[in-house]
Amino acid sequence: MSKIIPNSLIYFIYGFSFLGFSQNSSPIYLNPNASVENRVNDLMDRMTLEEKVYQMNQFVGLDHMRQAEKDLTEEELHSNDSQGFYKGLFSDDVAEMTRRGEIGSFLHVLTAEESNLLQELAAQSRLKIPLLIGIDAIHGNALVSGTTVYPSPITLASTWTDSFLEVIGTQTAKEMRATGSHWTFTPNIDVLRDPRWGRVGETFGEDHFLVGNLGAAMIRGLQQEDFTGTDKVIACAKHMIAGGEPINGLNAAPMDVSLRTLREVHLKPYKQAIDAGVYSIMAAHNELNGIPCHMNTWLMTDLFRNKWNFEGFFVSDWMDIERIDDLHNVASNLKEASLFAVRAGMDMHMHGPKFPEAIIALVEEGVLPLERVNEACEKILTAKFKLGLFENRKVDLNAIKDKIFTSEHQKVALEAAQKGIVLLKNQGLLPLKTTKTKKRILVTGPNANNQTILGDWHSAQPNENVITILEGLKKVGNQKGYEVDFFDSGENIRKINDNAISKAAQMASDFDYVVVVVGDNAMRYRWKDKTAGENMGRAALDLPGKQLALVKAIKATGTPVIIVLVNHRPISEPWLNDQIPAILEAWGPGSFGGQAVAQIIFGDVNPSGKLPLTVARDVGQLRMIYNHKPSAYFHKYALNKSTPLYPFGYGLSYTNFEYSKPKLSKFVLNSDEIVSVSVSVTNTGNYDGDEVVQMYIRDKVSSVTRPVKELKGYQRIFLKKGETKKVDFKINKETLAFYDINMEYCIEPGEFKIMTGSSSDDNDLQSIILEVEKRIEVDD
């Protein structure tokens, strides 16, 4: 019969053992003046096998568990994956495990108070090792209430501005550390190849060059060199690999891609992330060519760690080590699945019990080398020492308000929204001019007056911290002489009814303009309303529900209509482009999205966003990407157009830009030389504005087929009306390199078409020829 030891006795035993330990010697690992390497080695020498393995294991937060225990039935608890419930294990049990030092990391810890409590529990363990607390701070620390919610990643990608990502990363890190988190599961550097996938909004789009640059910038901002200090965090590149190309558009579906496609597309952003110093990488839910990514030795060990010198640690995605057994069926039980994962290079398990006992048994049986556990534990401990957690495990609750949602952070969030919103169409309707005679605007649509503008990966934020589109239009519109009214057509996109549509149309007849805010819903805390976001793949790309019927009814009144899209995957609705005079793609514009939209509609801000993906006319056109192969459209669709609705890199302005033909500093590239490409851009319109100048290349003849164009450079510039600026791009051997017929990375001799312009559309580009005379070998 077992006896329960009172907590007071546990505290006494732990306290006495540590007191005696510290009296005998001053441990090096507790000395902040010792080097990180020496502290790690000293601590490792003192740890048992069990304690090392515990550092490799993660649990969800206690409050998260308690909410599940409170809200769900027992049957739901055992079946609801998203709640992270552990069968037979409750929040009080997890708290006690933390006190015993049996947990190394937590996620879903959403308050500083809980973070401090967990760290206090961990401080009572034998070695007092602090916890590494991770969170999905995808675009700001938005799962924590009161923080700055920056535009969603797809909106940030639409700025085509690396510096925004770096600044936002730095600011996000400060808000994370202020609220008790140290590790963010971002950036998502999946290269989007199928927009049916629900997670489009958390990616940087379809081009590996743009994705890689923006991801590396975010990593630099979050980690700020080597993440040493108390205002920096660990970044996590995810999802390794090819998660953006599921065979059926659904999250976690198999990925079946060639080695060439892996090398040319999906792996490139990871190489950039590793070069940027990323310290953690998350494996993908999916299998890759028959092998679950969580047990892929070639990816984790052979390529990333041994060839590319990745120095950080790998973490599993949500319960995916278990899925090696119970979903992929390539292991007979969790113990075998754990062996396959850790032996392949996996360092941390997300999340829950049973993994530690499996790893401990495997080591004791001699099946898994102790060195593999030591390697994983050392990397995790290194992170904790560099982050300063041994000296600063808790946060100052009184200091939080001065570190989150600051005026500086708000300014950046607004500017990113202003520059990430894309003007898709404008037949002279926008901007709406200041009027002396009162004009009336009706605002309606399911996304007009709620927090859908915050995108995915956010919790409900204080209303005073969010400017909805209705609120923005009212504030700016009133200043311009407009009366702005609202009709609530219903917030649930799935349930817009005919009665609401009829009433909206009746009201529209009495107004001068109607702004209809449609799209989809990615708010994860309103699961039954969602139409986009994680695990929300769709078989169509049209406006879900009766939103198009709402727009058509209003358009039929004859009142001019402005469409604002708030969405987290591209919307394929050719009717809108054919019939509506003005369309704004706002994506998820963040805390100040409503203000940014209003400033663009009324002309205080000139739109300058560019699409980081291709928008197809219909789901039947998929896969539709700008960098397709030459034979992709050799034949055409029988009854439909073969062109996109909007091309990659596209975005309008209230002004016009005229491009010169590109010029080269020399016409032949030799091995280690750099060739400059210059183009002059003139603002020929009536407004000052930003333009994103783009450079593409095409290898005219090659030993294997190459894309019809590849993005290789971009620059955002500001031009006053009438002003001309020269933009320079650099071309070196890395710019032109590819994998030849023998999968050797090189440049083959021949001609390269260098293109510059305002989008990837051929009509927007001008070109010049660069020659390479001899084969050039390039390191990959």
Where are these regions (language model features)?
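Bacterial Sec-dependent N-terminal signal peptides
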Residues: 1-26
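Glycoside hydrolase catalytic-domain context in secreted enzymes
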Residues: 20-737, 749-756, 760-762
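Flexible, membrane-facing loop/turn or short amphipathic-helix motifs
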Residues: 740-742
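Surface-exposed, short loops/turns at beta-strand junctions within beta-sandwich domains
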Residues: 745-747
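Short beta-strand elements
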Residues: 763-780
